């Protein structure tokens, strides 16, 4: 029968390395989304039933365009961090690396497409 201390049981399991920084980024993006999501819902909801020309004119104003762009950027950044953590915890081997690269590419591409669409409408 072996008596192991908590430290001895944890030896060899790896370190958290950048876990604190990742947690901080997720907390900041969560607070950002907590503020931006209601703003986005109210600005998008206001323009939801408008005719096309009125909606384009509405999003040509700076406030709705900025709220939309910030929501896109912070939302996709938060998505990337959360899904990357999920993949790192539950997927192993080559699939892990491929899924992380795919997630990063998807999140940056979707954020860029969303920002491009809003900027194109705003200008």
Description of each model-found segment:
Residues 1-123:
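Membrane-embedded alpha-helical bundles that constitute the cytochrome b-like, heme-associated redox core
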């Amino acid at each position: 029968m072996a008596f192991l201390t908590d430290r001895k049981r944890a030896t060899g399991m790896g370190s958290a390395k950048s876990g604190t920084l990742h947690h901080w980024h997720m907390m900041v993006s969560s607070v950002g989304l907590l503020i931006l999501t209601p703003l986005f819902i109210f600005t998008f909801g206001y323009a939801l039933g408008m005719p096309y020309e009125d909606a384009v004119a509405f999003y040509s104003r700076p406030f709705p365009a900025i709220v939309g762009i910030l929501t896109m950027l912070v939302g996709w950044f938060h998505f990337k961090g959360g899904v990357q953590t999920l993949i790192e915890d539950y997927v192993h081997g080559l699939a892990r690396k491929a899924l992380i690269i795919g997630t990063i590419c998807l999140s940056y591409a979707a954020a860029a497409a969303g920002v491009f669409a809003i900027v194109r409408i705003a200008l």
